[in-house]
Amino acid sequence: MAKPAARPRKKVKKTVVDGIAHIHASFNNTIVTITDRQGNALSWATSGGSGFRGSRKSTPFAAQIAAERAGQAALEYGLKNLDVNVKGPGPGRESAVRALNSCGYKIASITDVTPIPHNGCRPPKKRRV
């Protein structure tokens, strides 16, 4: 005898007040991830996933759009306060932080967590154009 089909339970979104926005700004792309204090991802967006391709991915405007998309998606969790961790040398660093600020979040701190080598790996050779 077949079991009756179990009704799918509606997933309840938990409410989170404080979160961390991780902005990874490389020379080619910008990735914005918003997590809770424990590091569980609530939302994320990238410049490439926001419709920008090629060299337009690495622009500050593309980083702004990606941060706005991640910020709007995280608002569903009731997020109010953000700490911002910025990593990387890319051109979208400041514009992504400004976009999160314009989404209505109260930004408590901005921290630069760019990894700096203590004479580690050899850097790539210089470009000859």
UniProtKB/Swiss-Prot annotation:
PROSITE patterns: RIBOSOMAL_S11
Annotated GO CC locations: ribonucleoprotein complex; ribosome
Pfam families named in the record: Ribosomal_S11 (PF00411)
Keyword S-adenosyl-L-methionine attached: no
InterPro entries: Ribosomal_uS11, Ribosomal_uS11_bac-type, Ribosomal_uS11_CS, Ribosomal_uS11_sf
Record-annotated membrane-spanning stretches: none
Keywords, sorted A to Z: Ribonucleoprotein, Ribosomal protein, RNA-binding, rRNA-binding
Gene Ontology molecular-function annotations: rRNA binding; structural constituent of ribosome
GO biological process: translation
Function recorded in the entry: Located on the platform of the 30S subunit, it bridges several disparate RNA helices of the 16S rRNA. Forms part of the Shine-Dalgarno cleft in the 70S ribosome.
Quaternary structure (record): Part of the 30S ribosomal subunit. Interacts with proteins S7 and S18. Binds to IF-3.
HAMAP family reported for this sequence: Ribosomal_uS11
Family in the record: Belongs to the universal ribosomal protein uS11 family.
Protein name: Small ribosomal subunit protein uS11
Encoding gene (name): rpsK
